[in-house]
A protein has these predicted regions:
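C-terminal motif of bacterial Sec signal peptides marking the signal peptidase cleavage site
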Residues: 2-4
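Low-complexity, intrinsically disordered segments exposed to solvent
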Residues: 6-257
């Protein structure tokens, strides 16, 4: 049985950990939910919460009432691939917005309806709260809370819980231009692998996600499973590519995201 961080002695370039392992779980979960964060932030900014259908994949409909909350529906129907990240999704997400997302304490809450991303069914709680401007650099600051289940086609699943701070490090001054956005992600997460092994994770250095890039481009994640050695995923030096390293004890393995 594969349990914690998987140690290899001969492989030099591999996929980002077997999906049964703790590092595989966090790569899948972080990718899934950060992709949704990027999508929602982009469309809310671009739409200005105006009523109407605003996209094709997904179909995006914003319903504006005379007062908050308002709702935005993202509908992938029976399935389509996003032009931004190439990921095929199906089903629906409804985002309820309690107030303008530049007002402190406004909350955006996701509801999942038969939502599937890359073949995996997603359910649970996902919330984004605006905390105001960060002290020192005035970056917009958001709290991200997730408690979710990711179910695979074979009906096995992983549990994932995350509490992050998402900082809008670049691009907040140009709200209608999404491509120049850069986000820094800090926090902690925990979960249970497909094989029932608990793990926790922290971020020794903030993970950076550029809107112009499909992958995390820098930062690191320290993963500690309840069984086996800890490991670190290092996303690199800022270059936009699908490469990272997995460090387990004295071994460093190149991985492809």
């Amino acid at each position: 049985m594969l349990t914690g961080c998987q140690k290899e002695s001969t492989i030099t370039t591999v996929q980002p950990g077997d999906k049964n392992t703790s590092e595989g779980s966090i790569v899948i979960a972080d990718k899934t939910f950060d992709g949704l964060n990027g999508l929602v932030f982009g469309q809310i900014t671009a739409s200005g919460l105006k009523s109407g259908t605003l996209g094709t994949c997904p179909s995006i409909t914003a319903t504006l009432t005379t007062s908050f909350p308002v709702t935005i529906t993202f509908d992938w129907g029976t399935g389509c691939a996003s032009a931004d990240d190439g990921i095929t999704r199906s089903g629906k997400i409804t985002a309820s917005v309690s107030g303008m997302m530049n007002m402190v304490s406004s909350v955006l809450t996701f509801t999942f309806t038969d939502f599937v991303s890359e073949g995996n069914k997603i359910s649970g709680v996902h919330k984004i709260t605006y905390l105001g401007l960060n002290t020192g650099n005035n970056w917009p600051r958001y709290s991200i809370f997730t408690e979710a289940k990711i179910e695979f086609p074979d009906k096995k699943f992983i549990n994932y819980r995350a509490e992050y701070i998402r900082l809008h490090a670049e691009g907040s001054a140009t709200p209608l231009i999404i491509a120049d956005d850069v986000w820094r992600i800090e926090g902690k997460s925990s979960g249970k692998t497909r094989e029932g092994i608990n793990w926790t994770a922290s971020y020794p250095s903030a993970v950076v996600k550029k809107a112009s890039c499909k992958w995390f481009s820098s930062g690191s994640v320290l993963i500690t499973p309840e069984v086996g050695p800890s490991c670190i995923i290092d996303y690199g030096d800022g270059t936009c590519d699908n490469k990272a390293t997995l460090k387990i004890e004295d071994k460093t393995i190149n991985i492809e995201l």
